[in-house]
Amino acid sequence: MRVRWLAAALCALGALTLAGCDSKIGTAAVVNGSKISESDVSRYLDPSADDASGARSTALQYQIEQKVLTTALRGKNALPSDEDLAKGHDQALSNLFNGQLSGDAANQALAKVLGQNGLKASFGEVLIRTVELENAYSEAINASQAQDAVAELAKQHIPVSVNPRYGSWNAQSFTFTGLGSKQLPSVVTLGTTLPGDVKSSNSQ
């Protein structure tokens, strides 16, 4: 059974050490000693967008999540190869739309949503890889529920630090405050719960 747990998992209550990011110029975030540069973030931003602030934080958020998941999987000697992860590409893409779209239709819809929110279509591959890693981690620990994955991830104490210029970092949901359905409304409408929506989804 597939578990879409990342929306809730990365709050982890102690799994992450959050602090002001290294002040070195060009650093957006550091995950377990691995740097995410500002150029890693800006490469996914649409230069024609009116307001890049939300897109910038979204681009960084998912790159952080990828590194956390990669570190967690490696710690369990369960990190799949890029080739093995890619085998789940089409299913991960469809899962972004809760199974309601797939193939070219899903690719086109995702590119449109990203463009409407200041992100290049190439950022879609970041989202898809994040879902692939979510699936791999859930399978690695045989998680049947989101809270099982949260508890297991918390045991690894993966350190994360973030440059505050990217927004207000929420240590409870492991997201930038305000991200979620506001950034990718069409995807959420189709059924996906994004990380920024964790509190509202849990309170219902």
Kindly give the residue locations of the regions a language model identified:
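Short, low-structural-confidence N-terminal segments
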Residues: M1-A55, K155-Q204
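Terminal low-complexity, poorly structured segments
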Residues: L6, A12-G14, L110, G115, ...
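N-terminal targeting/tethering segments
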Residues: D22-K120
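Alpha-helical structural motif
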Residues: S37, A106, L133, Q145-A146
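Short, hydrophobic/amphipathic alpha-helical patches that form generic packing surfaces
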Residues: T70, L133-E139
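Cell-envelope/extracellular anchoring and linker segments
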Residues: E83-A86, S94, N98-K112, Q116-T130, ...
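Acidic/polar surface patches and capping/hinge elements
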Residues: S138-R165
